[in-house]
Amino acid sequence: MSSADVITLPKLLSKVPEIFGNLPGLIKGSKMSKITDTNTPLGLGVAFEKATDSNPNGVAILYEDRELTYKQFNAWANRIADYLASIGLKKGDTVAVDVENRPELLATVLGCAKLGVCSALINTSQKGKVLTHSFNLVEPKAAIIGQELVEVIQEVRDDLDLKQNFFYFADQDTLADPGTAPEGFTNLATEIKDCSSENPASTHQTFLRDPLFYIYTS
């Protein structure tokens, strides 16, 4: 893929967002980066579940006035994974993600990772034809759009190859208040409320060379 870089676990180890703080399973990057066994389950989902088991009540997310423990954040990601699985997404699929840097973005990436679904992290500054190209390039099976990016997506909606499965996250604490999705979008925060918060078995079906997310370069 000429304009997207695949990020797998070894590359991720040096790129963990600061918002995750001290994630025990990933801090040991020097050890994990030496793993060569392609049959050993590992990945962001595996690492986060291990961190949750060892420190469930520790603070995983600090963002503005929001604070989430490992247990809370893991459960949130599990509900996202459960819902995406319920609509047919599976390992090897791609989801386009156009959300600014906030907890909803991280929960989405982690939820997708637990399914083996690759998150295509759309550059939030893109518009028009550039946005259309980036979006269509990865052939997503679904799209998760933040309220802050709905307008620019709507401007190119007719040019996008994806015609269904457009999901929405309000630009607020969606765990406290899911907000209301605009026409043409499904409110993901509402849909996941009754989904399972248990760790999915699919987490342990991701391996060393499975992609985690796409990032876009010029």
Which residue stretches match the model-derived regions?
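Flexible, non-catalytic linker and terminal segments flanking ANL/adenylate-forming cores
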Residues: 1-41
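Structural core segment of the AMP-binding/adenylate-forming
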Residues: 2-15, 86-87, 114-191
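AMP-dependent adenylate-forming
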Residues: 20-30, 46-69, 175
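Conserved AMP-binding/adenylate-forming core of the ANL superfamily
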Residues: 36-44, 57-102, 106-110, 127-135, ...
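Residue-level signature of the cytosolic catalytic core of signaling kinases
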Residues: 40, 44, 145, 181-184, ...
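Short hydrophobic/charged patches on amphipathic alpha-helices used for structural packing
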Residues: 49, 81, 132-135, 203, ...
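Conserved pre-ATP/AMP-binding loop-to-beta segment of ANL
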Residues: 56, 167-170, 183, 193-216
